[in-house]
Amino acid sequence: MSKILNPALKSLLTGGTVIPAHPLALNETRQFDEGRQRGLTRYYMASGAGGVAVGVHSTQFEIRDPSVKLFDTVLRVASEEIDSAKLDRPFIKVAGICGPTSQAIAEAELALKYGYHLGLLSMGGLQGWTEIEILQRVRDVAAIIPVIGFYLQPSVGGRIFTYEFWREFAEIPNIEAIKVAAFNRYQTLDVVRAVCSSSRVQEIDL
């Protein structure tokens, strides 16, 4: 059974908030600096942000490389720091999720293990996939963790999707939001129209 987003966190997300992408802290020899990484997490909490997104572009996708093996550590460190702060307000923990289905499922399960509330599901790097295959991947991940969809512009590895794709996407249970970074008004409107036409129009945030 998939995890469901806490109502207080959903209310924060729907009301509108700032969820910055968490950078990766390295020392002068380009090694992971855990102390400064934890300091960055504390900074975002102190700044009044509504949450942080960890394991996304600013955290560098290379942390997933087998030769680097930092994805687990980076997710764990941020989550530990947030939990130890014992904030008296909602704070959304978002984990970046990417790759083919098997990788995306493994990352979703890891995010859940460390107490993340949402998975920001990238659809980049799937140029050879059909829209039907990508939608099934979304369903598989959403069966594990609540999902924020991510429409990424083609110039940085994304792809263009049809209105029909987003119409089906919006009907998938446990999709909580869609981040639209297509940087194209027509593609953006496709997402807006699809969500507004779906049965879940009152449940999905943009």
Regions found by a protein language model. Give the residues of each.
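Catalytic alpha/beta core domains of metabolic enzymes, predominantly
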Residues: 143, 153-206
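Active-site beta->alpha loop and helix N-cap motifs at the rims of alpha/beta catalytic domains
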Residues: 2-160
